[in-house]
Amino acid sequence: RVWVSGALPPFAAAVRERVRSLGGRLDESQSPQDAALCIVTPLGEDASACAAREKLDPSRTVAIDVLLGLDKRRTLMTTPLTSPAMREAAHGLFSSDGVPVSVIRDSAGCVVQRVLAHIVNIGCDIAQQGIATPADIDRAVTLGLGYPKGPLALGDALGAHTVLTIL
């Protein structure tokens, strides 16, 4: 059984839908039943902090990064106490459709979240200092680095609240 935290409703809905589509059995209760795999969806925090805040058993808790969706790659984050059986259950479930899954150790937020938020932050700082216009910054990054979006366009897509929460 898989219990998904509802702390971030849009992320929780995406994970619940993915668990269903992968054939996982959802635990729909308010708090996880004994022995259920607990999935949290952190935004700017680690799996341990999520487990502590939500009073979850850290040995059954695994975080999944859903900031950029779940279609191309999935990143799971374990707590220092996550049992190998729960880690393997989460990996097995989320990789069952062939999408690559990476498992990382507990860290201060998910790697992709931190990198993207800092790129946005640096772009905003350059614009705020008047070094370049927002349009020029975005153009330079897309042309010079080959990024699909510039830092300010990325910030607009993610939303200021999301970026600030991650930072």
State each model region's role.
Residues 2-27:
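Short, charged N-terminal beta->alpha structural module
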Residues 21, 54-62, 69, 73-107, ...:
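Internal alpha-helical scaffold of NAD(P)-dependent oxidoreductase catalytic cores
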Residues 25-54, 74-75:
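Short, well-ordered secondary-structure micro-motifs within conserved domains or adaptor modules
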Residues 1-3, 34-41, 59-62, 71-76:
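Hydrophobic beta-strand segments of well-ordered beta-sheets in folded domains
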Residues 11-15, 86-90, 119, 162, ...:
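General structural feature for long, well-ordered alpha-helical segments within catalytic domains
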